[in-house]
Structures are given as structure tokens and as C-alpha cells.
Amino acid sequence: MNLNEFAPFPLIDGHIHYPHPSQLSRLLDICDRLQINRFNVVCTPDRSRLSLIPDALHLKAQRPQQIYVFGGLDISAYFRAPAEVGQVFAAQIDQLLATGCDGVKMIEGKPDMRRMLPVPPFDSPAFAPYWEKMSASQVPIVFHVNDPEEFWDPKRIPGWAVERGWFYGD
């Protein structure tokens, strides 16, 4: 593919996972090679690390005019205060913005996250304060709300999805 055909248009990648600071140079090299003008690093819960936000903000500091960071919510609220997650998450928004995040990444709608976390229904009263805060503040959200239907069908699911543990059928 000749990317020069798209040269008059800025190329923005709205959804990049940044796994570890050891990948900083590699990620920046890839974005430069692909002529990505700006990109958004999304921070999701990680079973092996407390938070990806500090690493993502460090990456953003390398190129603040090019990189956005969407911080993830502190999922411990699902265990500590399940009936009050909306209040807890609403309070986290100001903290995320103050640290340099530009928005929020929610992966709680992904089926494997819903199996791992006691996430209340998104339209439940527990989430109301959070949605009100997000609406009033106009903070952008990247919200993973499900996975493709073939991830429930053993005959249709791609092998790469099975390898990642994303088969959800019986």
C-alpha cells in the first residue's frame, strides 16, 4: 500500500495498546514509518501490572503534541464498593485529567472482563453518577462494549482469538 496517497490527510490511530516502556522506541518508530500524525494510547486493566497509566504518560511526554492517553478506571472499585462504582469512578475522572490523561478507556464491556470483574449493568443506578460526570465534563471515552459474535461460535472463531482466550461459548 502506498501511504503517500493519503499524504494530504492526517492519519490518526485512536486505539493503541502500549504494553511496556521497553517498547517505546519500537512504537514510535512504527508510527513514524506509517506516518501516523497522532495516536491515542489506551490503558486497560493488566493482570501483571498495577497500572499502565504512568508508562503511557511517560510515552506522551516524549511527544506531547502527537500522543493522547486514555486512562483506565481503577477496577478495584468493583470489589470494594460495587454499589457505588459510579461515585468512585466519577471522582477518578478529575484525577486522570490532572495527571495528563485526555480521556477514559473502558474495557469493562468485553466479555472476558465481565467474567473477571463483578461489573454491574451499565444502565444500573450504580453507574449513574459516572455517566452524569462524563456527560457534564464531555471527557471522551473509548468504550469496549462487546466482541464479535463469532467469538461465541467454535466453528467461526479465528485461531488468534482462541489463543488470546476470547472464546466465550460453552
PLM regions: where:
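Active-site gating/metal-coordination segments in enzymes
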Residues: 4, 53-169
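An N-terminally biased module of ancient metal coordination in phosphate/nucleic-acid-related enzymes
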Residues: 1-65
